[in-house]
Amino acid sequence: MANERTLSIIKPDAVAKNVIGEIYSRFEKADLKIVAAKMMHLTQEQAEGFYAEHKERPFFNDLVAFMTSGPVVVQVLEGEGAILKNRELMGATNPKEAEAGTIRADFASSIDANAVHGSDSAASAEREVAYFFNDNEICPRG
């Protein structure tokens, strides 16, 4: 498997529950390195831009409202097969369907307030990382 980068967002519900460190610990135990990170409160414009591909979907406005409801932590994860590994750590989008021990099974409360976002493909990862981070903000850790 190739060394990859992927974008991860700890969403407002998980930040409010104060489980950032527990989620970071899971990344690190899975041999994913955090090579960039920042806490921010997304503006309406930032959230709409990030989720632009969902603009025509019925859940778009609720998603934007939720993602701007409080601070998020955005990070770039790096490692062997990072995209798939992060998706496995997160679990199913709906926490009721997520396997026990996944981030969403343990920390999410609903399909909307589902604790984390992770890139779903190499193309998405590249686009999403670039949306939040300049190259000089990413610190490769070898």
Curated annotation (Swiss-Prot):
This enzyme's EC code(s): 2.7.4.6
Entry's localization field: Cytoplasm
Active-site residues, record numbering mapped to chain: H117
Keyword terms: ATP-binding, Cytoplasm, Kinase, Magnesium, Metal-binding, Nucleotide metabolism, Nucleotide-binding, Phosphoprotein, Transferase
Reaction catalyzed: a 2'-deoxyribonucleoside 5'-diphosphate + ATP = a 2'-deoxyribonucleoside 5'-triphosphate + ADP; a ribonucleoside 5'-diphosphate + ATP = a ribonucleoside 5'-triphosphate + ADP
GO cellular component: cytoplasm
Domain of life, per lineage: Bacteria
Keyword check for Cell inner membrane: no
Record PROSITE patterns: NDPK_LIKE
Keyword Nucleotide-binding (UniProt): yes
An example molecular function term from Gene Ontology annotations: ATP binding
Pfam families registered for this protein in UniProt: NDK
GO biological process per UniProt: CTP biosynthetic process; GTP biosynthetic process; UTP biosynthetic process
Swiss-Prot/TrEMBL cofactor(s): Mg(2+)
Amino acids binding ATP: K11, F59, R87, T93, R104, N114
Function: Major role in the synthesis of nucleoside triphosphates other than ATP. The ATP gamma phosphate is transferred to the NDP beta phosphate via a ping-pong mechanism, using a phosphorylated active-site intermediate.
Known partners and oligomeric status: Homotetramer.
Family: Belongs to the NDK family.
Protein name according to UniProt: Nucleoside diphosphate kinase
Gene coding for it: ndk
